[in-house]
Amino acid sequence: MVKKKAFLPLLYLTSIVFLPWWISLSFNKSLEFWITNWWNTRQSETFLTDIQEKSILEKFIELEELLLLDEMIKEYPETHLQTLRIGIHKETIQLIKMHNEDHIHMILHLSTNITSFIILSGYSILGNEELAILNSWVQEFLYNLSDTIKAFSILLLTDLCIGFHSPHGWELMIGYVYKDFGFAHNDQIISGLVSTFPVILDTIFKYWIFRYLNRISPSLVVIYHSMND
């Protein structure tokens, strides 16, 4: 009975780790057909972000330049000009396909992430007992650590998350999340998040040290400040 009680939380933890991957894989395959069909048959109005509009405009400017080049080389044989026109036409069709695929992927990723969040929330509520057991294990493990190890772990974690070299890591992580939700890459938004999010985390962490650690373990705070200095 004791082994069963210990096994269920571990099984629950494993399922929590692999469930998002399984949901993403399953729903991407099942929803892709329906979203593609809906976009191609019912979508009558085009919505473009500033980044997408700029990208498409640049592509059309390139095509326009090719057309101007076409006018400038009228002395070339008709077969050559015909080949050039066909190439421009194919490029235009490819541009439209890329635009449609970008929107389909954005809707697909957004739908999958919302569905995953709902399923994981329900799964967490249903597994409240297992979460309580896992939480007690974590608290017991942390309690048995020495103050020096705790201070070293906190210092290492803070340096990784909000240290001098952390902006590049935040840029990669925020860019990945931004892309995972299907949004077009935007350097201004990502740069703004990278410059503000670690600052917010740093403020929350200092408040946590002041309100929580000072109350439960003053010696840990002293060791942490000594190592940090």
Curated annotation (Swiss-Prot):
One of its GO terms (molecular function) is antiporter activity. It catalyses: K(+)(in) + H(+)(out) = K(+)(out) + H(+)(in). InterPro entries: CemA. Pfam families: CemA. It is found in: Plastid, Chloroplast inner membrane. The keyword Hydrolase does not apply. One of its GO terms (biological process) is potassium ion transport. Keywords: Antiport, Chloroplast, Hydrogen ion transport, Ion transport, Membrane, Plastid, Plastid inner membrane, Potassium, Potassium transport, Transmembrane, Transmembrane helix, Transport. It is a multi-pass membrane protein. The chain crosses the membrane at residues 7-27, 106-126, 189-209. Signal peptide: none annotated. The keyword Transmembrane helix applies. One of its GO terms (cellular component) is chloroplast inner membrane. Contributes to K(+)/H(+) antiport activity by supporting proton efflux to control proton extrusion and homeostasis in chloroplasts in a light-dependent manner to modulate photosynthesis. Prevents excessive induction of non-photochemical quenching (NPQ) under continuous-light conditions. Indirectly promotes efficient inorganic carbon uptake into chloroplasts. HAMAP family: CemA_PxcA. Belongs to the CemA family. This is Potassium/proton antiporter CemA. It comes from Eucalyptus globulus subsp. globulus (Tasmanian blue gum). The lineage of its organism: Eukaryota, Viridiplantae, Streptophyta, Embryophyta, Tracheophyta.
